């Protein structure tokens, strides 16, 4: 198990480059098996989830080559293979293989997905979408078995109860080779969905309306990759570095961003008093002065992203007065980081799943646990702010979502080391 050791209290400065979007990458890799020709993805982040997805592809005889930020995937010799629950349970995004396998083979056998522990994240909308396309779905021995009818999947009108990113992406992948037209109503509008649609359209799919709440897909016979696909920048990684820069930065420029993907987040940070200059594809975050508390409410895109409520929390602690409020309307139970911040001296608490933050003059180093990716990012920022040494256990969770994090932090001047905990078997050593 990984530990991140931070000797904090040092102002950081310099430049940082944002990697490709994790939430695109973890869908694009499974979607690659829909192609009958080799796929090239560029701008791929070096994160643990990518390595885990490559392992799952290996189970299906799909060859992968990952060099620097380019991932080559060759599915030409793919075989239909059940994906075991053991490997699936470490990776929530493995559920995208349901839609991808169903679209490619007309059948998917996938163990129940795992990933971050942030409360209930049911996949009932995914299942209802597959059933609307004509598939049968059953649960057996901790596996989901999805089977298309003998004459294949048929297009359908599917109305999502809520705009789920995962369900929208899975239905797109299953329906691109279905017969006829599929319409997804109340679809999620996240930039990562546009990225997936662009990738599939460049392989011959016919998808219109991605980025709106109604997506139309005309089924085609097969897909063939023709050109490399460059993944969009990671808006969550970018937002995390904005928070870090405002908390402990002495002037940091963040490169490779799409500002409009961060509109809701940047508006809230600037409401606090953080000064940011935006160029065409970069942001410069000035050293923060006196900041004021704000209220944060997460929402589906284009609202404030749930994945950024934890990274902004340390910034609230730097305000000079008042009470900051964080309400996560997407995952109300995403509060595990609060007890860990309290170990570091943070004046923060939870009441009825609402986070209440108060000015905290100084954090101190402590041993804390990164229960999931974004909680880990929150604690990482807090550790960089704190006096003394902070040890973050389960730091492998941070590596699941943040590209080359140790290297990037050191380039900004941070004293950070990631190592294996000698008391726990090491995993993900190749990240």
Curated annotation (Swiss-Prot):
Keyword RNA-binding applies: no
Catalytic activity from the UniProt record: phosphoenolpyruvate + UDP-N-acetyl-alpha-D-glucosamine = UDP-N-acetyl-3-O-(1-carboxyvinyl)-alpha-D-glucosamine + phosphate
Gene Ontology cellular component list: cytoplasm
Database matches in InterPro entries: Enolpyruvate_Tfrase_dom (IPR001986), Enolpyruvate_Tfrase_sf (IPR036968), MurA_subfamily (IPR050068), RNA3'P_cycl/enolpyr_Trfase_a/b (IPR013792), UDP_GlcNAc_COvinyl_MurA (IPR005750)
Keyword vocabulary terms for this entry: Cell cycle, Cell division, Cell shape, Cell wall biogenesis/degradation, Cytoplasm, Peptidoglycan synthesis, Transferase
CDD domains, per database record: UdpNAET (cd01555)
Main location: cytoplasm
Positions with a binding annotation for phosphoenolpyruvate: 22-23
Assigned EC number: 2.5.1.7
Active-site residues, record numbering mapped to chain: 116 (proton donor)
Enzyme class: transferase
UniProt keyword Cell cycle present: yes
Pathway: Cell wall biogenesis; peptidoglycan biosynthesis
Subcellular location: Cytoplasm
Gene Ontology molecular function, alphabetical: UDP-N-acetylglucosamine 1-carboxyvinyltransferase activity
One GO-annotated biological process of the protein: peptidoglycan biosynthetic process
Amino-acid positions noted as binding UDP-N-acetyl-alpha-D-glucosamine in the UniProt annotation, renumbered to this chain: 92, 121-125, 307, 330
Highest taxon, organism lineage: Bacteria
Reported function: Cell wall formation. Adds enolpyruvyl to UDP-N-acetylglucosamine.
HAMAP family (UniProt xref): MurA
Family: Belongs to the EPSP synthase family. MurA subfamily.
The protein's name: UDP-N-acetylglucosamine 1-carboxyvinyltransferase
Organism: Lactobacillus acidophilus (strain ATCC 700396 / NCK56 / N2 / NCFM)
